[in-house]
C-alpha cells in the first residue's frame, strides 16, 4: 500500500510537517509533493492520501489557504476516490488567528468528501486551548464554531507559530492513529 503525501505552502512549514510524516511512515508514504508543481491526476493512483494545507489570513469565505490548493479545490470532486482513505493536516496560528484556526482544512475535507473519499484522521480538541473558533470542527463543518466537548477537528491541526514545541509529538501520535485507520 502506498499513500500519496501532498501539501501546499507559502512559508515552508507545511512541507516541514510532511517530513515528520514521512519519518513516521517510511516507504509506506511517497515523497511529499507540492501541489503547485503537480496536477491532481495521480491522486487516484495511490491507495490513500495525506494532504496538508495552511490557513492564510485571506479574509475570504472560500479559498482560505493562499496556496495552489485554492485553484485545485473544485477539481477534486471530479476524481474517483470512492472509499480511498484521505487524511488532512492543517497549519494555523491558534493565538494570532484563533478565530479562524486551521479553517482551510475544512475546505479540503468538503471537496474530498464530494469525491467519495473515506475521511480519516480526526483529532480530539484535547490540548488545543488557545483557539476560539474554527470551521473545521465536527459536527459543524463550514460553520464558525466555538469548541465544545465531544467535537473533533477534521484532521490534525498544527500550530508552528504558537505551539511549535508540540508539533513533532502531535504528528507522531496522529501517524500512529492513521496507520490503524488506513490499515498499514
Question: Can you annotate each of these PLM segments?
Answer:
Residues 24, 28, 45-184:
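FMN-binding flavodoxin-like domain, especially the glycine-rich phosphate-binding loop
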